[in-house]
Amino acid sequence: MIELVFSYIFSALLLTLSHRFKSLELKVLIKSFAFTLIAIATSLMYYAGVLDVVSLVLGISFSAIAILVSIYAIYYAREQHYPESLEPIIDLFLLAIIATYTSPSFIMLVITWTISEVLGFTLIRMGEEHSIEGSLTSSRGFILTSTMTYELSVFTMITLSLTLTSASVSLMELSKPFTSTTLTLNVPTPVIPLLVLGFLAKAALIPLHFWLPSAHTAAPAPASAVLSGLTVSLGFYGLYRLLTYLRLNYATHIAWFFVVTGALSTLYGGFQALSQRDVKRLLAYSSIATSGFISTRFAMYLIRPSTATLWGLVLGILMHAAYKTTLFSEAGLVETVYGTRYIHGIRGFIAVAPISSIGGIASLFTMIGVPGTIGFVAKIVAIYSVFSTYNVDVALAIAALIEILIYIIISALIALKYVHLYYGEKVAIVKPVVLRAPTGLQAPILILGLSNFVYSFTLLGTGIYELWLPLLVPIPLAMVFLYILAAHFKALTERVLHHELGRG
């Protein structure tokens, strides 16, 4: 574990050092090396038996995302005239989040998670102060709801372990790697709500969802991408790690709670997203809907821990990270190009930002569930895992299946609403302030979007061999479809813009 901690510290020093250089190429190189170092350290700790496969997959995947978001933040801060401190805070925030997902023990997880909460609050506060809207309530909602409830759950866990075991044994076990700890606690039923409260708030499940839309809207775009794509899922990751230590006597009842709250979150978040004009609020509410979907995946794992249910949970987290970091980054580009986030009057974005639009459309493919994307894989594995729990509780399996189908429909509807940003029948109301979006902002979004295809190959390492064929066969078709669709939209919107310029 010492080697992993050293890699965190060394990477933090490299990221801090990168901001002293004026050369963009050198900055990009140092940032890429720092996050790659974390991915390498994660792999080494996995092969040493310190980390499990969940930390391995999420650690490497999120390190790749971190490189792209970090590079995007360089250009975003300049275009939006943010203080120079935005870049290093974003980098340290990314590092803290990855360190949380790759923490080998509960104690280290608590430390890195707390650091990420402080940095997240700082970024939201920075966005509030930079915004012309002048709202100063989002950061307070974040710190009071997301952060304080999490600290309450951590305090409950540590107190419970100290009460049920000796202090020395408890702290020693909580400091051991998750892969080797032997601590098992019989949790009294009245204590369970206190244990899960903070994780529910972080996941923004109903009724603890209210802090998320304003916080994710107020933050700078790269921070919103990380807050939504990576930190919301920490709630479910924390619950997964909590199960390492707990012996639950009412697992089925708790699973029902997660399915019901998941369904409510999917419905509420989905319908709210469909009624939004602000692109960041649309994406924020869709995060609540996706949290509902992942909540159902966690419920299935809770009643029957297996390869299928575990990967159903992990792939749901990966899906959310891939498409949400892409679209929130694109939201920042939309604001840069048009000077507004209200997309109901924007058409023809693909002509202004042809490179990044391919990444954005790839993310919409994930939301729709186009074969070959991580969205398709996550939804297929989710349905498969439900059938694997059918013999445990039939009613629960049926309820979970209904929730998944609801999410599939709502997610597709949100994607169809968003796609009008690129093209549409109506003449654009809002005109771009630049003829071509900066390439420095477009390129990271393109690669982030393509991760929706790359991450689908995660299925090959799950051991669910019967699902390999549906993954592999349609991928070339999806890539061809993406190219044809992008070319069509570009030609269409260029004609519309040419017509408008001719009228002017």
Label every model-predicted segment.
Residues 5-8, 31-32, 62, 90, ...:
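Residue-level recognition of transmembrane alpha-helices
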Residues 294-304, 379-396, 401:
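Interfacial segments of multi-pass membrane proteins
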Residues 131, 168, 350-355, 412-504:
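Cytoplasmic/organellar membrane-interface segments at the starts of transmembrane helices
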Residues 1-10, 52-64, 106-119, 188-201, ...:
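Structural signature of hydrophobic alpha-helical transmembrane segments
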Residues 12-24, 67-81, 121-134, 203-217, ...:
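C-terminal ends of transmembrane helices
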